[in-house]
Amino acid sequence: FLNIDYRSLKKTAPYLIFFSIIILIATKIVFLAKGFSWSKPARWLYLGPFSLQTSDIARFSVLIFMSYYVEKKAEKLKNFRNGLLPALLILFSIMGLIVIQPDFSTAFMIGIIGIMILFIGGANFSQLSLVGSFSLLVGIPILMSRDYRRQRILSYFGFSNMEDVGYQ
């Protein structure tokens, strides 16, 4: 990656996001087509002798796309409807596709990366704070909806048996 001119990545940013959405959807569809249940983790896309962890490609794509978007729409970023909302819709779409894999930690990290780029790029802090608050209101019940996830979260914060559920 040291030899890649980062300025040339701007041209590919929209295509990278589109490609990421396609492969994230394809990953889940392939696992469902193979007869696995909806809740079975579907994080790898196997293409013959090759395998891809599609969320890693999505992470790279979000980083490139958000940087591209901030540069392209810098003057509109303070406006929620015309500047911030389109970027958030793309970000949350990618995050949602990763959550259904299910891979909550990667979705969370991608969200943090995207929000930080938007903030550094000049997005309104109060608007980002409202979006973050709303995301927590939606995200916490989803995270706590399954017993094993709730136990892992509680063990992470030291509220559970560390030798059992929290051991990795």
Which residue stretches match the model-derived regions?
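Membrane-helix boundary/helix-loop-helix interface segments in multi-pass membrane proteins
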Residues: F1-Q101, E163
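Residue-level signal for short amphipathic helical patches enriched in basic/charged
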Residues: I4, V99, A107, Y148, ...
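Hydrophobic membrane-targeting signal helices
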Residues: D5, I25-A26, F119, G139, ...
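Short helix-terminus and kink motifs of transmembrane alpha helices
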Residues: R7, Y68, T106, Q127, ...
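Hydrophobic alpha-helical segments of polytopic membrane proteins
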Residues: P14-S20, R81-V99, F104-M144, S155-Y156
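Short, highly charged low-complexity linear segments
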Residues: F31, T54-F60, G121-S129, R152-I153
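Hydrophobic, glycine- and aromatic-enriched re-entrant/interface helices and adjoining loop segments
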Residues: F36-W44, S129-Q168
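Alpha-helical scaffold segments in soluble metabolic enzymes
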Residues: F65, Y69, G114, R152-S155
